[in-house]
Structures are given as C-alpha cells and as structure tokens.
Amino acid sequence: MSEGSSNSTHFGYKTVDAEKKADLVADVFHSVAAKYDIMNDVMSFGIHRLWKRFTIESAGARPGMKVLDLAGGTGDLTAKFSHIVGNTGQVTLADINDSMLKVGREKLRNRGVVGNVNYVQANAEALPFPDNHFDIITIAFGLRNVTDKDAAIRSMLRVLKPGGKLLILEFSKPQHDLMRKVYDLYSFKILPKMGDIITQDAGSYEYLAESIRMHPDQETLKGMMVDAGFEQVEYTNMTDGIVALHKGYKF
C-alpha cells in the first residue's frame, strides 16, 4: 500500500481503514455529482477549463486513437477527445462512482456526443481492460482520491499500448509562499462556505481541500510514475503549481 500502513490510509486529514476509503470517497461524489460542474466553475473561477484545454493539447490525440478518460466524471475531457478521434476512434469514460458516471453520460448524450464513447464503472487500481489497449490515458483531478496510487499507476501502465502516453492533471503544491498562504486561506475558509451555499454540503469541500494537501507533490508524483515503469516523465506547473500536469510514456 502506498499510503500509511498496509491496512490504513488517509481520507483528507483523517486516518481510516484502507478498505473504507473508497466508500467514504464515493459518499462525497454521490453528494456533489449533480452540481459538480457548477462548483468546478465557481471554485476555480473557470480556470479549470484552461487547465483541461492544456491537457487535451498535450495529449496529442489523433483520429483513430483509443483514449481512456479515467475518473472522467462529467465528461469534459471525453467530449473533446470524442471530436478529435472521430468515428474511427474510441473514447472510454471510466469512473468508480456511478453517480458521476450517470451525470456524465446524460450530459454528453444531451450534447450529441455519441457513437464513439462508451462508459465503464471501474476502479483505477484494477482496470478491467486488456493489456496494451489504449493510446492515451488521462486522469484529471481523480488520482488524489485513489487509495493505492501506486497500484493505479501500474494499472494504467499495463493497459497503455507501447508508445502510449499517460497524463495526470491534479492539484499540487504552489511554488511561492504568498500563493501558498492565499491558497490555504481560500481552500480552508472560503471553499467550504461556497460548497455549503451551492450544494448544501460543506463537508465534502472540506475533504477536497484536505485531500489536495495530502496528495504527493510534483517531484514525488514524478518519482512514483518512474518507479511504476513510465519513461520520459515530466510535469508542467500551472497557476504557480496549484495544478500540475504530469506526462509519461510507456515504451
């Protein structure tokens, strides 16, 4: 187990049994699924769209490719990839949470994103796909919620084709003291209040802030990817490192 002892891990700042974390995280996303997109726009001031756009551009997807949008939630990346890979390609939107998957499916179908998208409820630690199957895997704002991150990264490596690329978009560590102080104030004082007003669920957004602080920093995550077997691993900080995009290849 990559976090804590063999039978414990963290849920935000709390130490919990590893077997219980998935259920606790599931409760959070069952609670916020219906207003997930609204909260993303509000809490990031819309900047999450720029972070995701950069991820799409960095992926280098082309017509005919197979893409896995892991922890794909409400399908922002899936919608873009669906257009890029076209009728000869395939995008799989996978999420462990059925509430998020349902919201994503309804949203994309209402927008006419059909034909080359399929939906799979899946645990990132044990992906239910064949070896060497996908050209590209993205996981955006999902890895920090995974109990055994090392197992998940190894699972992603297994299902990537040789030459395939993994992109991990995740909250990370601000690079400057002033930004860290402002970010902490926003995350722990303002964000839960916004969550309470919009979703009537301050607790889920307290967990969000805590889970971000407990997530590995940029260099640690890079090392985890290298240890799993990824090559040419690098990362790009965005918004002073509040978010980082890690990229690695399977050869």
Swiss-Prot record:
Give the record's pathway.
Quinol/quinone metabolism; menaquinone biosynthesis; menaquinol from 1,4-dihydroxy-2-naphthoate: step 2/2; Cofactor biosynthesis; ubiquinone biosynthesis
Report the source organism. Answer: Shewanella loihica (strain ATCC BAA-1088 / PV-4)
What reaction gets catalysed by this protein? a 2-demethylmenaquinol + S-adenosyl-L-methionine = a menaquinol + S-adenosyl-L-homocysteine + H(+); a 2-methoxy-6-(all-trans-polyprenyl)benzene-1,4-diol + S-adenosyl-L-methionine = a 5-methoxy-2-methyl-3-(all-trans-polyprenyl)benzene-1,4-diol + S-adenosyl-L-homocysteine + H(+)
Q: Any idea what this protein is called?
A: Ubiquinone/menaquinone biosynthesis C-methyltransferase UbiE
| Gene Ontology BP, a term | aerobic respiration
Q: Which HAMAP family match?
A: MenG_UbiE_methyltr (MF_01813)
* Superkingdom, natural source: Bacteria
Transmembrane segments in this chain: where? none
Q: Where along the chain is S-adenosyl-L-methionine bound? A: 74, 95, 123-124
* Enzyme Commission code: 2.1.1.163, 2.1.1.201
Q: Does the keyword Nucleus apply?
A: no
Q: Name one GO molecular function term.
A: 2-methoxy-6-polyprenyl-1,4-benzoquinol methyltransferase activity
Q: Would the keyword Transferase be found if you checked this record's keyword annotation?
A: yes
Family affiliation: Belongs to the class I-like SAM-binding methyltransferase superfamily. MenG/UbiE family.
Q: What is the lineage of its organism?
A: Bacteria, Pseudomonadati, Pseudomonadota, Gammaproteobacteria, Alteromonadales
- What is the documented function of this protein? Methyltransferase required for the conversion of demethylmenaquinol (DMKH2) to menaquinol (MKH2) and the conversion of 2-polyprenyl-6-methoxy-1,4-benzoquinol (DDMQH2) to 2-polyprenyl-3-methyl-6-methoxy-1,4-benzoquinol (DMQH2).
* UniProt keyword list: Menaquinone biosynthesis, Methyltransferase, S-adenosyl-L-methionine, Transferase, Ubiquinone biosynthesis
Principal EC category? transferase
